[in-house]
Amino acid sequence: MLKIYDTLTRSRREFIPLTPGKVKMYVCGMTVYDHCHLGHARVLVVFDSVVRWLQTLDYEVTYVRNITDIDDKIIRRALENHEPFGALTARYIQAMEEDAAALGIISPSFEPRATECIESMVTMIESLLSKGLAYVANNGDVFYDVRRFPGYGKLSGKSLDDLRAGERVEIDTNKRDPLDFVLWKAAKPDEPSWDSPWGKGRPGWHIECSAMSGHYLGERFDIHGGGQDLQFPHHENEIAQSEGVHGHPHVNYWMHNGFVRVDNEKMSKSLGNFFTVREVLARYQPEVVRFFIVRAHYRSPLNYSDAHLNDARNALERLYTALKNHAPSQAQAAEEATATIDWVNDGYAQRFMAAMNDDFNTPEAVAVLFDLASEANRTGNSHYASLLKALGGILGLLQQSPRQYLQHPAHPQNDHHSIEEIERMIQQRLQARKEKNFAQADALRQQLAEAGIILEDGPQGTTWRRQ
């Protein structure tokens, strides 16, 4: 029985989909004005893991992850760069897709762009106006009137008075209340705009997600996810918009992943500890970064540091080493490739399922992987290695060739030895040993060791891995 922590009710709830056997899920994606940072990577990996587990439970998942391709930040960056906003967003969408692919992210069922759904947004704003939940200001902007929505603040757990006291809101004389938020922004010179009943303009950020989720998933869907930073005001405002239009809750389970911290400090450009995914991938294999993310529970803070990434790299290496040392024969591998995981009788599989059904507890699931590796090392039984790979695959891990993974440079940007060069030196060492020139053979081994290359001599010959 799958249980999910629902942010709205602040409780673990049994997951019961609206339609048996099917799951509809929406996750807030990137605003594409820059490269993905570690916070984006966490959202991508966390909800990719959620989708993978739901599919493992035989649900048919419709997964929508939007792209915000029109926003104040995008417009400012395009003006700074003296380029069309469409060229800017196209470049960063391509970069995002490359980063997601590197991290092993399954493509969503739909990945709508805000600029493709303007008509749906206009229709939704018209409905809010007709219900008296929105108003057109003197400057042509359209605002949501938060005082007209009785449930405002229920996701963040705060009243309007609490929110007014705690929020730093810029004074806008066009608003009736400081917490009122914009649904439609009147056109300004040198900014992209679209036609609407209120004149040319562009949508506000919050209406984009309400319109896109409703367009692709309907008035009500199962799961809405995103980073903790979106809980207020973005998701609070989505509730006000969608419930305001439809008259009923539009999401059954709200999921939020925790913040990313860097060396126990908040990640920010002002502190100089801001890292893009590309900067991290220049130093670590993508699978190490994914493994680092799934080792932490999705709702817990994730503390990034070189020490933690190095620890994740070493831990993942132990799992791949177990796979390499205890790989099944070709015949066994072919047989086990068609076999399904025995969730009923296999104790390791049962523990893995219990962990994932407990609010996607990936740290406990990863612990099962290490127990399997230990059992494979203890018994030499390839069955445990096969199960290790199968369960790891559910988390998007351990699907590379163990030998290739272990031969990949630990820190790509610092790698000074190609595979061809390493193989050449190994052959030179083998030749030296044949000629009983053990001094030269030892010197070559030492030279490789100093470069972080570990040689392993065995009955089948010499293999190697990076330290």
Curated annotation (Swiss-Prot):
Gene Ontology CC entries for this record: cytosol
Record's subcellular location: Cytoplasm
Cofactor binding: number and manner: Binds 1 zinc ion per subunit.
One Pfam family cited in the UniProt record for this chain: tRNA-synt_1e
EC numbers, comma separated: 6.1.1.16
Keyword Ubl conjugation: no
Renumbered ranges of motif 'HIGH' region: 30-40
Keywords: Aminoacyl-tRNA synthetase, ATP-binding, Cytoplasm, Ligase, Metal-binding, Nucleotide-binding, Protein biosynthesis, Zinc
Necessary cofactors: Zn(2+)
Catalytic activity: tRNA(Cys) + L-cysteine + ATP = L-cysteinyl-tRNA(Cys) + AMP + diphosphate
Biological process (GO), any one: cysteinyl-tRNA aminoacylation
CDD domains linked: Anticodon_Ia_Cys, CysRS_core
Signal peptide residues on this chain, from the entry's feature table: none
Motif 'KMSKS' region, residue numbers: 266-270
Major localisation: cytoplasm
GO molecular function: ATP binding; cysteine-tRNA ligase activity; zinc ion binding
Residues binding Zn(2+): C28, C209, H234, E238
Binding site for ATP: K269
Subunit relationships: Monomer.
HAMAP family: Cys_tRNA_synth (MF_00041)
The family this protein is said to belong to: Belongs to the class-I aminoacyl-tRNA synthetase family.
Name of the protein this chain belongs to: Cysteine--tRNA ligase
Gene that this sequence comes from: cysS
